[in-house]
Each structure stands twice: as C-alpha cells, then as structure tokens.
C-alpha cells in the first residue's frame, strides 16, 4: 500500500472554491490561501442564522496506546461514510501542532484513504494560526518583562511620574505567564532570562522562566472557546499573567497589551476550510491538546458546520476521560451545545494493551505479538471499553462503537469483540471500520448506526454546575468522571485554590491535565481501575479561557522529543516534494 503522503499526492482534489460552493458558502465569505485552503468568515453565520442546526457527532476513544487508536482517521472516514449514504456532512478537527508531527505521533490528518488533504499543508503551518497564537502569547510575555524592568529600574513613583501610567508593582515571585513555542523541547521547561554582564542591567530583570508548547497556551483555549471576535477580545483582556505585591491579579488589560494581542489574532478567528480525499468539506480551527488543555476544536467551526450540513463529525483528544470529558464540562457549556451522539473508537491492539499483558511506552514500537489471537488479553482489556461506554452514558449521550481494523487483525477476534459488546449492552451499536484502507466505503455501516443513534436524542447532563465550588468541581471530575476515591492536593494547590476563590474565580470550570495513557494519573495502570487517588500538585488560573487548570501527577506542559523522533524520516526530493510525512 502507498504511504499516506503518496495516497494524498495521487488523489485529484477539487478547488477550494468548488468545495466551498458545495458546502453552501458564497465566494465573498472566503479568503483563499492557494488552491486547496481558504479562511471562512465567521460573519457567514449572519446569513445562515435561520438554517436548522444539524446533528453533532463527537468521536472519542478507549484509553489509547502512545501511537493512538485512530480517532482522526475515523472522524474523516465517518464523514465520508455519511456522504456515501447521501447525508449532508462536514467534519471539524483541530489544527495539528508541529510538536507531535516532529515528535512521536507524526501528523494528524487521518491516514490511508481517510485523510484531510493536502496533508502536508495541514500538518505544517496550515494558514499560520498556531504561529499567530505563539506571537500573541509571547507579546504578552515581552510586555510583562518590559513593565517589570522599567518599574524596577526607575522605582514606582518615578515610573508613574514619568509615564503617567499606574505602577503595577508586579511580584516577580508570582509571575504565572510562561512563554510558548510550537515544538517539543524539554530543555526550555526551566530557564533563566534577563541575564546581564556584571554591573549592567540592560537585558531586563533576571528571573526564572519556562516555556510551554503553544497548544497549551491559554490563547489557544480562548480561540477554541470564543463565540465571536468580540468574545475573543474580551477573553484576552481577562487573562491573568501575574499577581502584584498585594496578591491582586495583573491582567493583559492592566499591561495595555490585550488590544495588540487581539490584533495579532484577528485572522485566526476564521476557521480554515479544506477537504477530505473524497471531497467532504472540513473545517480546521484551534489546536488545544487534551492532556494539557481542553482538547477540542473551536466552537465557531462547529457553529458554521452545523448551519451548513445535516451532520457534523468532530473529535475530542485521547480517551473519553480526557477530551470528551472536557467537551462536555467546558466546551458544551460555553457553546450551549452538546453532542447528539458519541462514537468510541476501539482497536484490538488498544484493548490488549489495556489488559496489562503488554508493556507499551512512548517511543516504543508496537510489538507484532500484540496482533496474535489472545482471548485472555482481549477479555481483560475489554474492561476498558466497558468503562468508556459507561462513561459516555454518564453524560446522557448515546454511544456507538467503531472497531478500527488493522490489516494484521484476526477476523475471529473482531467477531469476538463485537459479541462482547453486544452481550455487555445490546443497545450499543457496533461496526467494524475499515476507513484507512477503503475510505468512506469502509464506514457505511458505522454511518448508518450513527444516523439511527442520533435519532434517539440525548439527555445531556454535565458532571457539575457553575455554582459549585472549585473543589467540588475537581472532585466531580475525579470521583464521578474517573472513578477515583479522592483527590490529594499539595499545600501549594490548596493555597492556590483558596486564593482563586477569594478573588471570585470559583464560578469557573476545571480542566485537569493528566496522562492520556491511563484513566488514572499513573500511565502504568491500565484497564478500568477504581478507588485510586488523584494527586494535584498545582493549579493555574485561566480566567480568559474560563477554567482553572489543575496539573496532576507528573504531566508536562512542554513535551520532550524521543530518542528517534519522526523528524528523522522527513526530507525533500529534488522536485521539492515532502517525503516521509505520515
């Protein structure tokens, strides 16, 4: 079989103008970027306001192996399958970060015959939104350090007299805004900035600093959660970057940099339109990770797609304990729109990995032995799929299971897995998906199940209400959402929690950063554990995004590269074609 990029390169694509017209967009509602990409003006929603909303289908997964179980390929393949059965459909996905593209997982365009195309343009830069987020974020960092430098150098009274600005009196020990970049670079997790030659201070105020990956930026979450440009601007102004010497928040509005940040992000408010290999219109917008952010594409993209099509297929990062939980408790409440149906992607290898019989770690190749028939491992790992089915049902949303088939899979084991699901819950429809090898044809049964399941109707119920305290919200996610027995907060986290509530931020949602490789915070614990503790070491305030960010276990907000990163496979041929991208 051809590689992903070869399949993409050998598939004829429609012009983006044709794709847009087929979706129901007008020429003046687009800004084209070459032959196959266009920015879609959110103002098109004014014209479409009377259109009935379509059905929202969210794709999640079991607890994945480090290489993933195929959510994106299923999202794209299902959209093509729905098109095959004559349904009006669009897909909405996140913009890939170059960190994973060059790191472990590779690209995020789908794969095989279920891809967003051109896949190289999607995976590398796209229309520059992530770079704009990075620039706007680091502008706030530069403004913060400049203000700190001038106030410290001159003294507060002299600074106020000279500039007519209020001295912010920033507490250098309580700066919370790190810098960001769109690469995996562990060496930047802890750095010192503002270093000077002896006797000089021209380079700023020396302090400890760190970098996060751009996907973890609060601005990325804001872009994904904003309902329009006005909302984006207001959220940017609420960002807290530090605290003053009295413990009061210092915001981007206080630094008078919020407007310039919004200007930098002006073009990012528009989703990027592309197409699948079978011509299904696809909106790409925002790229927050699900392990260290809220893990869903934008509300604006969903709004546009729901007005243009009968079905919108989107995905949430990692397993249902991760991106799906945040889709329900953060995104759905911000959008006032919950999914009508959830597709849970499962694989034989993923379930066997959850049996505890295999030791799969990031950077390791999947062993061939995992594809050998192993009933004991399959049945033990099936507990994880049961957990995820029950988890989706906690939110009152009906579920469909898509078994993503690999070429090495045993037909007998696929039949056994279908039987296990049917015995566990006969109301949960299940289909074997072969979208990687067959495109939309491989998702026709899945598409039919999704249409039928959407008609059941959802009775959506999030895990907590806005009025509950921050601690109650954390406990709801950990105990009800994960099955933990309790949370264990560090002294630092307890102090931060009390401070946030004192400042009036207890009405915010909560976003827990944890490993995606286990339902717990320990990646070595597989299956469907219960009764465990969730250690929370630190809280971060994301007042603009609208949530408090809890760091659990040893999760890092700046990933590192493995010993054999995927960038080693990338190159250009003599004609300038990219090779090795997957």
From Swiss-Prot:
Extract the InterPro entries matched here.
Formate_THF_ligase (IPR000559), Formate_THF_ligase_CS (IPR020628), P-loop_NTPase (IPR027417)
> What GO molecular functions are on record for this protein?
ATP binding; formate-tetrahydrofolate ligase activity
Which PROSITE patterns did the record assign? FTHFS_1 (PS00721), FTHFS_2 (PS00722)
One Pfam entry name:
FTHFS
Keywords, alphabetical: ATP-binding, Ligase, Nucleotide-binding, One-carbon metabolism
Q: List the disulfide bonds.
A: none
* ATP-binding is among the record's keywords: yes
Top-rank taxon: Bacteria
Coiled coil, from the record: none
Q: According to its UniProt record, which reaction does this protein catalyse? A: (6S)-5,6,7,8-tetrahydrofolate + formate + ATP = (6R)-10-formyltetrahydrofolate + ADP + phosphate
UniProt protein name? Formate--tetrahydrofolate ligase
Its source organism is Vibrio campbellii (strain ATCC BAA-1116)
Gene name, per UniProt, is fhs
